[in-house]
């Protein structure tokens, strides 16, 4: 029998942004901020040590990326000039080759997923 394992860890950061590609009367056209939450998922076979990846090792990969965005204007970050939740999830996925999926929450009710195919 073959079993696939996934682990997910949640991270948080606060940042401001505006969406330059929306209509002028759209509320997100103006600068505003979010308390973002991201979930990083890793899918892989179980290793001999009982882990897919140790959460501590995952933190060493993700924390520096979160630090690049925390308390920043996301529009100023290369690759996030149009910082939709979709683009933010893609930004993380492109920088975390080990991740199988990234989920970015702008609010508790609104999120976007980027999934490696």
Question: Which stretches of residues belong to each language-model region?
Answer:
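Charge-rich, low-complexity N-terminal segments
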Residues: 1-117
